[in-house]
Amino acid sequence: MPPNLTPRSFNRDDGVTEEYINGLPAYPTPPTTLANEEQARPRTFDDFGLEEGLVKSLKGLYGEDGKTTPIETLSFHHFTQPDIASAPIGSQRVLLGAETGSGKTVSYLIPLFHHLKRTDPGPSVTSSFFADSENTLHPRSIILSPTHELTRQSTQFAKILTHNTKLSVHGMSSTVSGGVGEKRGSVDVLLGTVGSLRRMFGMTRSEEEQEKEDYIRGKRIWQDEQEKGMVEGDKVEWVVIDEADVLLGREFYLDTISVLSQVKQANLILCTATLPPFLINLLTTNPFFTKKEPFIHLLSPGLHKLPPKLLTRFIRPSTTGNKHGDVAHQVRLTLAEDAKAAKAEGREGEEPSKIVIFCNSDKQVEQVSGILGTKKIDCLAWTGAGEERLRGRNGSLNDFLQRPHLPGHEPPAPLPSLEPRETKPIFQDKNGTTPNVSQVTRRRVLVTTSLLSRGLDFHPSVSSVFLVQPPRDVLDFVHRAGRAGRAGRPGRVVVFGIDEGGTLGEGAKNNKGGKGQGPLKKDGKTALGDRLKDVLGKREVVGAMGKRVRT
């Protein structure tokens, strides 16, 4: 059962001083060790003795000469050791840590599929094997994600990787009810959010908790249309917690451990892009995690670093003090800059560039998208309770997401970004009339909150990420900025309200109670600035009108 007490320094805001050594958190335990370059060197997919079907899928995705990323090398090497294959279920406890866009999803999916295939009992079991199999689902592995969007993307990718291996994969976020749908009996891999797994395990919230959740989210995206208790944890061999720094963070911590408590005994893999002090402390002091052997840490040499080709552009506030107007102006300048570069490089026939704008609240998403609308910049506003957030599918969001596929299996074209009959206009002109949106088929600007900053792999056409307000700390900055410049591609992150030294703009200084800024110091800096320079690569400061001030 989950412990009753929250461990000390469980979250970042409890007043406990965070000590960093070589960019890694050292409180309250000695600093963890990053792998060296030799340990994490690129290797071919044939080097590890992986299942033949998995190697075939990897080569189909990344080419016959494709090689592993550092975290993939570390993970594949560890999980294919002979003693790992023969180890009893429940003995494997591994923490995978790597920078954004570095192949973390592959680093846990491939070893998971490799072991599931090696121990595959054969075709899906029948009711003669499980007395209640006609009514319940018995997964062999569970993958937990923080959002339905990430669950759907991971499900799609998992099905691609298992195309030549014939393992069964089921994603709960791809069903209208957010449950197991018609699936019964056995399934090799079950993917879902913590909330979905709680419901399917038959765990319920109190009426007070449910009312609070409804109030926070505005509405329930997933109605209780499917009976609870449809999943049994008795056959689970592996559990993966994707985005572990989120699911073991303050908001999801108790729910995540309550899901883990439904599994009798299973190997556990944690995957994360950041390693904050509270996560280290949780794994080394919490009774739920310390009752077994300590976690093995497989950490990429690039952990806590931004993508190497990512340019950070700090925008000085304009004299008008209209930050949202500055954002709209920078959107136009950025799209024009991308179009000019595409023409110069002969890429005019490629998919036009796109921008993702991160805000700190649903209200700010509404404000920014409204200003963009008045400037005739069409955008997709995406929030937890937004009208375009659909059950069972990503809908308009697919325009901005990566669409992987095997050769000869082209993915379907994304749905049109606007469906005039259903989509509510997000702005009106000065006369109170609504522009005709029926002619718009693709939007190039996405405005959202941190809902989409964790784990999602955006399409290569997403060239830029805008941060309208400073994130609460450097780790949040890494998550949001890392949505661009992924997989070795060039990109930029455009930051408003704070410069590279952590100094806030005048408007932000006057708003000392603003969310997401971190503690304001006497010199006008936030805690973010203390370590921001450690993660930045190429950077520049630009005036509100687009003139470069310095690099």
From Swiss-Prot:
Ranges for region Disordered: 504-527
Q motif, short sequence motif: residues: 43-73
Motif (DEAD box): 242-245
SMART domains: DEXDc, HELICc
Chain sites annotated for binding ATP: A98, E99, T100, G101, S102, G103, K104, T105
GO molecular function ontology, one term from the record: RNA helicase activity
Record field: catalytic activity: ATP + H2O = ADP + phosphate + H(+)
GO cellular component: mitochondrion
Domain Helicase ATP-binding: 85-293
Keyword line: ATP-binding, Helicase, Hydrolase, Mitochondrion, Nucleotide-binding, RNA-binding, Transit peptide
Segments forming domain Helicase C-terminal: 334-551
Keyword flag Protein biosynthesis: no
Enzyme Commission code: 3.6.4.13
EC category name: hydrolase
Range annotated as the organelle transit peptide: 1-13
Localization of this protein: Mitochondrion
InterPro entries: DEAD/DEAH_box_helicase_dom (IPR011545), Helicase_ATP-bd (IPR014001), Helicase_C-like (IPR001650), P-loop_NTPase (IPR027417)
Matches recorded under PROSITE patterns: HELICASE_ATP_BIND_1, HELICASE_CTER, Q_MOTIF
UniProt similarity note: Belongs to the DEAD box helicase family. MRH4 subfamily.
Function: ATP-binding RNA helicase involved in mitochondrial RNA metabolism. Required for maintenance of mitochondrial DNA.
Written domain comment of the UniProt record: The Q motif is unique to and characteristic of the DEAD box family of RNA helicases and controls ATP binding and hydrolysis.
Protein name: ATP-dependent RNA helicase MRH4, mitochondrial
Gene designation: MRH4
